[in-house]
């Protein structure tokens, strides 16, 4: 993980996590189907289930007041993906039953830190991803907090995530350490060909929102 400095949210600094998940599914699913004789499907982000709740129910972390999954080891800087199956839980070695999700201590740090909550506005991350013109108020918030894409303010305020970062939490997966872009510039964006651009999580809204945001930050 970087030290936090930059204008791109942590999750979008590496290549697109969807790319990693697709490769993971391609390796795991054929082996699972061969072993169990059932159908398996992988999902990441676009999923038929509420991923953060399901992950908490699976014991992978607690749900924060910012709706993020918070892992004890990694804080909220985690990606959630899942493989669903037609197999019965017992077939896969699970005892069955429906566990309940777990929740954070509700200290309120994330909500207090968010510059948008008190104003009744959209998450700053959503503002950075909007297409078209921003309102004067939205432009002011974007320039004040310096994000070209996404926002980590509520996550960085969370004491559970702070503890994970202080402990030096780092993913062992090399993919997420390679070719990172903590700071995006107009020059860096212009030098990306379409293939490279499409390998980034910030590409899904096209180049225009990014260019607009970068121009605002440079004013």
Residue ranges and their predicted role:
Residues 195, 203-219:
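Long, compositionally biased charged/polar accessory segments in the mid-to-C-terminal portions
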Residues 24-28, 110, 154, 210-214:
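Alpha-helical packing segments of well-folded alpha/beta enzyme cores
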Residues 109-128, 146-174:
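Iron-sulfur cluster-binding cysteine motifs and their immediate structural context
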Residues 1-103:
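Auxiliary alpha/beta "docking" domains used to position bulky ligands
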